Design a protein with these regions (language model features):
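Conserved protein kinase catalytic domain
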Residues: 21, 36-39, 83
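The conserved cystathionine-beta-synthase
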Residues: 6-7, 24, 44-62, 68-69, ...
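Short secondary-structure boundary/capping segments
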Residues: 27, 35-37, 56-57
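A glycine-centered beta-loop-beta connector
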Residues: 3-19, 59, 67-81
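Cyclic nucleotide-binding regulatory module and flanking cytosolic helices
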Residues: 21-26, 31
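Bateman (tandem CBS) regulatory domains
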Residues: 31-43
Length: 91
């Protein structure tokens, strides 16, 4: 699961379990480090009104789509989220 890292009202990164585990591996004192030291700050932003196909290049890169309404963070979409959405549409 990915979590947004916010600075005020702005998304500045995302972090997931593997980011945290890789950051603290071998030194449990690193659990005290700021979240920003473990986050991914290169974000693939997609406009809220973009077609679903705009997600495909993001997922092809193995990234998470950061959904934006202008400059406002709305949410994030993972490949699994898209697969679950498509599965529900078929049922």
């Amino acid at each position: 699961s990915q979590l947004p890292v916010m600075e005020g009202d702005h998304i500045v990164g995302i972090v997931d379990e593997s980011d945290v585990l890789l950051h603290v591996y071998g030194d449990e004192n690193r659990f005290r480090d700021p979240v920003a030291t473990a986050m991914v700050s290169k974000l693939d932003k997609v406009a809220m009104g973009a077609p679903i196909e705009a997600l495909l290049p993001v997922f092809d890169r193995g990234h998470v789509a950061i959904v934006m309404d202008g400059e406002r963070f709305v949410g994030l979409i993972t490949r699994i989220d898209l697969l679950n959405f498509l599965r529900r549409r078929v049922q």
